[in-house]
């Protein structure tokens, strides 16, 4: 899919969130889209296991959805290694993988020239899930609750 022409978020991401029944693992540099936030909260309320990794760079921006997601009980870890976590990827129900240039923002939906691959393949989903959990485990658990300061190296 390509944005803004194809509306990659509303036609690609939202349907996958809405039909997920088991798990959603997201690595996203910046997430401000309210539709996605609401859909993720609905999915959590359906019992879907959701985990999100985001970067510290824009966490405190007014449109950032990190706090709303955390308040809804969705675990969000914040990576703080000076903008290092720049992925835009997600795995849904161990079957679908999104790899994209697209942050999940209004600008990515309506303004920016973006691309998004949605791959239905369990092997690729397994590899991306493994990478997600490698990153997840590398981030201290305290950053599920705190917003870290910038640093140039991994904190122990």
Task: Briefly describe each language-model feature range.
Residues 6, 10, 23, 35-156:
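PLD/PLD-like phosphodiesterase catalytic module centered on the HKD motif
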Residues 26-33:
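Short, glycine-rich nucleotide/cofactor-binding loops
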């Amino acid at each position: 899919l390509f944005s803004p022409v194809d509306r990659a978020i509303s036609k690609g991401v939202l349907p996958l969130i809405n039909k997920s029944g088991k798990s959603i693992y997201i690595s996203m540099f910046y997430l401000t889209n309210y539709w996605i936030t609401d859909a993720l909260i609905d999915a959590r309320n359906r019992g879907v296991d959701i985990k999100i990794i985001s970067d510290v760079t824009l966490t405190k921006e007014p449109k950032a959805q990190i706090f709303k997601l955390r308040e809804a009980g969705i675990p969000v870890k914040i990576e703080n290694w000076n903008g290092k976590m720049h992925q835009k990827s997600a795995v849904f129900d161990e079957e679908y993988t999104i790899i994209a240039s697209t942050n999940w923002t209004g600008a990515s939906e309506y303004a920016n020239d973006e691309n998004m691959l949605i791959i239905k393949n369990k092997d690729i989903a397994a590899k991306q899930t493994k990478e997600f959990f490698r990153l997840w485990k590398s981030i201290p658990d305290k950053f599920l609750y705190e917003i870290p300061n910038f640093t140039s190296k991994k904190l122990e």
